Regions:
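Outer-membrane beta-barrel proteins
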Residues: 2-175
């Protein structure tokens, strides 16, 4: 919980000084390959600087078995028409701790009063002895509840070595 609080404060201070967004989300994660179910807490933040979209994500998952796992990712991308391809780096603080690369793409569209975002990302390269392969498809609908505050509804599905389904809610703040 302390890590989540620190990550939230860092993200809020970054977002407040640079403009952009911060969201705090909680997902119920179900393993599809006999693994352990978990609850994942996310702090996400982002901004745009000189046409480059910068983002970050801290994910802390508590499994039913009592384990606590955390990862942190930073990404950079640039809009190409309706899509935003991105690259990034991540660090998994799991059992052995390792670094990995990311590539992905997102697209956002106003739908009704809110905004729908869909995307996919995959790990590339890793300092892990036996690299864990993971591709994640994700979707979020941000429904405005105040001028700069939204309610987020999230869904994702992981493929390859990590096979999970996740559904959750969160709150987003724009600056």
């Amino acid at each position: 919980m302390k890590k989540l609080l620190v990550a939230t404060l860092v993200a809020l201070s970054f977002g407040a000084s640079a403009g952009g967004y911060v969201s705090v989300d909680v997902d119920n994660v179900s393993a599809r390959n006999g693994g352990t179910d978990s609850v994942a807490q996310y702090v996400r933040f982002g901004t745009e600087v000189a046409g480059v979209q910068l983002g970050g994500q801290s994910r802390t998952a508590r499994s039913n078995g009592g384990g606590l796992f955390n990862s942190f990712e930073l990404t950079a991308g640039s809009a190409l028409g309706p899509v935003n391809p991105f690259v990034g780096i991540g660090h998994d603080n799991g059992n052995n701790g390792y670094n990995y690369g990311l590539v992905g793409v997102t697209a956002a569209q106003k739908v009704g009063p809110g905004v729908a975002l869909v995307g996919v990302k995959t790990r590339v390269g890793s300092t892990e002895t036996t690299p864990t392969k993971q591709t994640v498809g994700f979707a979020t609908y941000a429904y405005p509840i105040l001028k700069n505050v939204s309610l987020n509804v999230n869904a994702s599905r992981s493929y390859q070595d990590i096979k999970e389904n996740a559904f959750g809610l969160g709150v987003g703040f724009s600056f």
